[in-house]
């Protein structure tokens, strides 16, 4: 059993030890990152999470998303392929998978997938738009699902305009009300993923998502709008993507998020250090030069393709070979090193953990967070 596995077991059994164990993990990662900048050969793949798009089908048409249209149209991951994937992940002691899409609840075998994953000892959570969550939650909860994350794109007509389908906000609210009536926060962890874009970089939008999360006893995760994901688009006239003239709005929004973090530390999933860095991630984009820790990740597409991360470093296809034949191969370790050295489009996936694992970035944004809080 690895040190990481032992630490996770201890944290589950003794939750009070989790902060200390996490701090130790981050410190070890910073040491490795520093060493990797001098000796890249020390960087090797060590998968901690696999993100799996189990279907490209979706019941929305979000402005920023290409799934089911230009990206893998019609693709669905077969149950047998998923079974082989999870068996290999469990054998390799991969701790967790995230199921998403598309809309994962549209997959006919989604409940069986959750049940199988949990039965093999692999942690499992799901990202969904929640439109039909109330119709599936009883079976999913019985199968072992305990955490759900959802995209948040505004409320009322603003939400409907973004997802390009009328009446969907009201349906989502109805679904969430039904879910929470049966499963409170002690039974089901809910998280809203707030997309920080040109449309939402304002205090009013942050207040809206804050009230919405509090209504459902949920946490908030902040996603800075992407500029390099193959399945993401920037909307008509690039209306989602930040521009230099947005700097004042971004700064005010980040300051307000830091204020909320100080008052309600558990509401926002990111640390104050990570939040302070988001201004640079939003405005500097690919000019940010922070080593990437994608060595911890794998991404699986609905067509069976396997990449190191959401953007690049193709490792193979599950329709042609098993995951066990890709994991920790020379190609996998090389991809991990290339990602670390930013020999790639340099996206901002895992931005929060990257700044916390990189000594110079940690010092910079720790000081910035303190200055802006005071």
Where in the sequence are the language-model features?
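Secreted/processed peptides and extracellular or luminal domains of membrane proteins
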Residues: 64, 68-71, 298, 315, ...
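Flexible mid-to-C-terminal extensions adjoining Fe-S/redox cofactors in radical SAM and related proteins
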Residues: 9-10, 32-33, 41-42, 46, ...
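Radical SAM enzyme [4Fe-4S]-AdoMet core and its adjacent flexible, acidic
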Residues: 1-12, 139-293, 297-307, 311-316, ...
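A general structural signal marking secondary-structure boundaries and capping sites
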Residues: 69, 108, 180-183, 261-264, ...
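Residue-level marker of structural boundaries
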Residues: 71, 91, 168, 332-333
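Polar helix-capping/helix-linker motif
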Residues: 13-16, 271, 328-330
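Residues that line or immediately flank small-molecule/substrate-binding pockets and catalytic motifs
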Residues: 69, 101, 152, 224, ...
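Conserved alpha-helical substructure of the radical SAM core
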Residues: 5-147, 228-229, 367-368, 374
């Amino acid at each position: 059993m690895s040190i990481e596995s032992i630490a996770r077991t201890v944290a589950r059994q003794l939750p009070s030890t989790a902060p200390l164990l996490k701090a130790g993990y981050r410190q070890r990662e910073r040491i490795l990152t520093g060493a990797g900048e001098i000796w890249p050969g020390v960087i090797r793949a060590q998968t901690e999470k696999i993100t799996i798009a189990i279907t490209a089908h979706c019941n929305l048409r979000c402005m920023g998303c290409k799934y089911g249209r230009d990206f893998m149209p019609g693709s669905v991951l077969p149950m047998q392929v998923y079974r082989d994937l999870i068996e290999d992940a469990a054998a390799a002691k991969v701790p967790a998978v995230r199921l998403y899409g598309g809309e994962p609840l549209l997959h006919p075998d989604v409940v069986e997938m959750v049940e199988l994953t949990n039965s093999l000892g692999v942690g499992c959570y799901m990202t969904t738009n929640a439109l039909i969550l109330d119709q599936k939650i009883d079976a999913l909860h019985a199968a072992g699902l305990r955490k759900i994350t959802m995209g948040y794109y505004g409320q009322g007509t603003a939400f409907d305009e973004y997802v390009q389908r009328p009446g969907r906000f009201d349906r989502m609210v109805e679904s969430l009300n039904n879910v929470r009536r049966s499963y409170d926060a002690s039974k089901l962890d809910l998280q809203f993923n707030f997309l920080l874009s040109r449309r939402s970089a304002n205090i009013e939008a942050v207040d809206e998502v804050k009230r919405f999360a509090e209504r459902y006893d949920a946490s908030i995760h902040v996603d800075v709008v992407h500029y390099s994901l193959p399945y993401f688009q920037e909307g008509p006239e690039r209306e989602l993507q930040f521009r230099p003239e947005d700097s004042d709005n971004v700064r005010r929004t980040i300051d307000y998020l830091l204020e909320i973090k100080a008052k309600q530390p558990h509401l926002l999933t990111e640390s104050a250090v990570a939040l302070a860095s988001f201004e640079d991630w939003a405005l500097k984009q690919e000019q940010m030069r922070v080593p990437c820790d994608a060595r911890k990740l794998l991404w699986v597409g609905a067509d069976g393709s396997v990449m190191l991360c959401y953007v690049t470093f193709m490792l193979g296809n599950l329709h042609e070979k098993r995951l066990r034949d890709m994991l920790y191969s020379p190609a996998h370790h090389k991809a991990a090193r290339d990602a670390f050295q930013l020999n790639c489009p340099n996206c901002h996936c895992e931005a929060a953990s990257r700044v916390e694992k990189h000594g110079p970035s940690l010092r910079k944004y720790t000081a910035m967070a303190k200055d802006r809080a005071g």
